[in-house]
């Protein structure tokens, strides 16, 4: 009996940690992540809301980089959402999951994915707020320095989103004085597409920190699958889409880090601005209506 009990104990210890599907859902859209302790959190899905049966068939894509928040250090040719100089001068960072939790708010659910560096005392929380009555998910990041000295953040995106390659077009607004808000449609091609602002006070003058991705051809007003993204930030911003030799585009959004590295002292936490994400099968106007509802109810004073 003792030998049998010992064998069962050893079997239990040897079993690998099971990955957990973390579902972040509003009334009509879902963002699904694969979270396994000791491994990077990875994207599984973003789009129309899924049911329980759909969730069972999701697997992590193998023809792209699905890390939810890629850090600079282990795959240096790839674009990173986070890069830092540690207190000892090292530039390498790795982030693996340590768990997740969910908190209820009055009209939303906030999901937190906890990440940490296995070597350095750096903790990163990926935050997702899904509204119950509006098809909008806010994504932001909180970076905590537990090292003995100050670390320097050199890249600190709010979020990254992989988008499957195909006939994908990006719509955005640009302009100048007396000709603001000129709508442009750009087909995503290999390379990088960057929208950035360095002005500091007129950061909606020449461009806007918001884009829409039409997934099946040039953006149409009332038809087609569309991902919308808007950075809720009034300072210098950067939106960047990277298309490389994988089967995905990679969209990064956050504070423009150009000449703006941040010195994070021991014990301090840095919080990025939120990136608002939506999805619609009713074209550009469908995504726009989602932003309008969210903005009036939750962003604008007396909206």
Predicted feature locations:
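N-terminal signal peptide c-region/cleavage motif recognized by signal peptidases
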Residues: 14-16
């Amino acid at each position: 009996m003792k030998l049998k009990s010992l064998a069962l104990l050893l079997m239990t210890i040897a079993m690998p940690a099971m990955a957990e599907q973390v579902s972040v859902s509003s009334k009509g859209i879902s963002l699904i992540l694969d979270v396994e302790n000791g491994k990077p959190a990875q994207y599984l899905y973003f789009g129309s809301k899924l049911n329980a049966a759909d969730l069972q068939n999701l697997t992590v894509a193998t023809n792209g980089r699905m890390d939810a928040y890629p850090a600079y250090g282990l795959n240096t040719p790839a674009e990173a959402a986070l890069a830092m100089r540690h207190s000892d001068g090292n530039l390498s960072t790795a982030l693996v999951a340590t768990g997740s939790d969910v908190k209820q708010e009055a009209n939303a659910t906030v999901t937190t994915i906890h990440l940490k560096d296995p070597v350095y005392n750096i903790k990163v929380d990926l935050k997702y707020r899904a509204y119950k009555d509006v098809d909008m998910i806010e994504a932001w990041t909180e970076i905590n320095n537990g090292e003995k000295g100050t670390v320097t953040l050199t890249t600190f995106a709010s979020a990254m989103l992989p988008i499957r390659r195909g006939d994908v077009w990006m719509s955005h607004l640009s302009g100048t004085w007396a000709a603001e808000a000129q709508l442009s449609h750009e087909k995503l091609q290999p390379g990088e597409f960057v929208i950035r602002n360095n002005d500091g006070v007129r950061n909606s003058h020449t461009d806007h920190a918001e884009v829409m991705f039409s997934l099946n051809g040039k953006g149409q007003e009332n038809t087609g699958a569309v991902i919308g993204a808007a950075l809720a930030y009034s300072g210098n911003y950067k939106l960047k889409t990277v298309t490389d030799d994988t089967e995905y585009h990679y969209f990064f959004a956050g504070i423009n880090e150009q000449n703006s590295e941040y010195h994070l002292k021991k014990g301090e936490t840095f919080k990025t601005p939120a990136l608002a994400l939506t999805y619609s099968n009713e074209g550009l106007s469908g995504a726009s209506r989602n932003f309008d509802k969210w903005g009036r109810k939750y962003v604008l004073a007396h909206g």
